[in-house]
Amino acid sequence: MKQLLNPLKGNSDKIPVWFMRQAGRYLPEYKKIRETIKNFLDFCYDVNKATEVTLQPIRRYHFDAAIIFSDILVLPHALGWEVDFKENIGPILRQFRSQEDFKYLQSDTNNKLEKVYKIIKKVKKELPSTTSLIGFAGSPWTVMSYMLEGKGKQDFKTSKKFVYENKALSKELLNFLIDKTTYHLINQVESGANILKLFDSCSGVLAEEEFTEFVIEPTKKIILKVKEVLPKTPIIAFPKGAGLLYEKFIKEVPIDILAVDQMIPLEKMKEWSDKVIVQGNLDPVVLLTNKEIIKEKAYEILQVMEGKNFIFNLGHGILPETPIENVEFLTEYVRSFKK
């Protein structure tokens, strides 16, 4: 039995553990491979290298899940949108400004995403049978905000202003991304992923009305469409920074697993775990400290969530400067936890 799926099967005796960005720049073996390829998107499409870095943290830490090495921006890139990654800057994109910009988006991915699906198939063959494989995509609002801003996370004035002033056009772009995201997720499961995750990293910048329109409704549509085809596939949703709107999200979106950030009180996580499986929510910065602090902060979470429907994770991704021994210590502490 795959340990990560234990809460779904009503078995919460052992707490599953994996970490966002567990394959990444904090690992020396990752850095060694990253040095061999200049362009980040080429890296994401390289079947052998992306497979290897997906498996690296599993070999090192034996996490209960592997998450495929990819990026939320491979989808717009595969659809013809101009996306590039600049060193020490991050993603730079063609900026979506008007109806005319739809001409730069294609109706299909022209097989560009086939390499992602090949990576999943290859990882699946090499992954231990007890380890879950997570496929993922960026939620439509987050991908859309990158397209509207033309770059990585800013103050979101540009994207929010666009939405306020161009509601119909915004909905048209949103619906386009809903369809393509659904297609991408289904293909990942058909290639071998057995859990899916939707990352909505930018959801916390929206007021309630826009949060409902651009986060809740799109996520709900995607999940319902995926479940029509793949009713048994668990789906994780991560509306990062949603704050009080997490409550509304849980009530209205038919998710299996809710990932939460470190700002959410533990008692809320405990309360929500009666309705959904909760995943989170250690502050990634804690892993930059020492073993005593890591143990203290992990204990605070574990003693509240032990026996609940819970997956241990971080409130966001592992930071590049994280010491590898701290990740090992935390993982072993979670596995051996007893009150």
Curated annotation (Swiss-Prot):
Residues that hold substrate according to the record: R21, Q22, A23, G24, R25, D71, Y146, S201, H316
Keyword Lipid biosynthesis found: no
Spans through the membrane: none
EC class of the enzyme, as a word: lyase
Principal subcellular localization: cytoplasm
GO biological process, one term: protoporphyrinogen IX biosynthetic process
Keyword annotations from UniProtKB, A to Z: Cytoplasm, Decarboxylase, Lyase, Porphyrin biosynthesis
Keyword Lyase belongs to the record: yes
Catalyzed reaction equations: uroporphyrinogen III + 4 H(+) = coproporphyrinogen III + 4 CO2
Recorded metabolic or biological pathway in which this protein acts: Porphyrin-containing compound metabolism; protoporphyrin-IX biosynthesis; coproporphyrinogen-III from 5-aminolevulinate: step 4/4
Function in brief: Catalyzes the decarboxylation of four acetate groups of uroporphyrinogen-III to yield coproporphyrinogen-III.
Family: Belongs to the uroporphyrinogen decarboxylase family.
Subunit structure: Homodimer.
Protein name as annotated: Uroporphyrinogen decarboxylase
Gene name tied to this protein: hemE
